Structure formats: structure tokens, C-alpha cells
Amino acid sequence: VNKKLRALIDDMAETMYKTEGVGLAAPQVAVAKRIIVVDDQSGSGLIALINPEITHAEGSQVGPEGCLSVPGYFGDVERFNKVTVKGIDPHNKKVTIKAEGFLARIFQHEIDHLEGHLFIEKATNLRLITDHPEEKEIV
């Protein structure tokens, strides 16, 4: 992992925090690299992974998701409740992370971006939240 890659990770984290997101994948900022940054706001801090992959998944959860790439849209998405993710951290160390609940959801959402998928492909009850008091049903 070189300085240029670390700078990209720093920029991605800054973008994620400025937009009040909990995750960001490199393709969302027009970079064709397999990098994600994640912070589930539980106090454990930023997680940055290069070449992340889900090596184990179990259970099921359905919950609401939105995305910085599809502003204003929200929908319910079924995801695994527990995942094991392997990747390389910014210090060039191989890491394995076991996540469940919200953090597991974020990992799956961001890794989907690396595979060219958006949450709206999996969402039910997709809706557009506007500045108006009513919600607009899409699907």
C-alpha cells in the first residue's frame, strides 16, 4: 500500500464523513479500485479495506438502506445478519473482521458497489424521501 493509495483512502473517509454516510466504495468516487471505507458510528472508528471479500455469511435481517449514490431513495433490503470479511488494511496487513447487524449490512452494501450493484436492485418498499411531508412510493 503506497502513499497514493493511503491518500485515496483518506479522501474517501473525508467524503463519507462530510456526507454523513456510514460507508463508501471507491467506484462511488469514480475510482476503479476495490477499496471500501466503513464507520458504523458505534465508536469503533474507521475501517478501510483493500480487496475486501465476504468469506462467510449466515442468518438473515431485513432493514432500511439508503445510498450516497442514489440520494433521497430508501428501501428495505434483506442481508445476511453475520459476515466474515477478509481484506488488506491501509498498513498492508491482512485482516479478518467478523461483523453482525448494522456493520454486517454496511460491509455487504459497500462490497456490492465493488461488484457493480446498487441497493435499489435488492430493495423492496423503495421510496423517495423529499422535503415534502409525504413519501413517494416507487415500487
Residue ranges and their predicted role:
Residues 1-139:
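Positively charged
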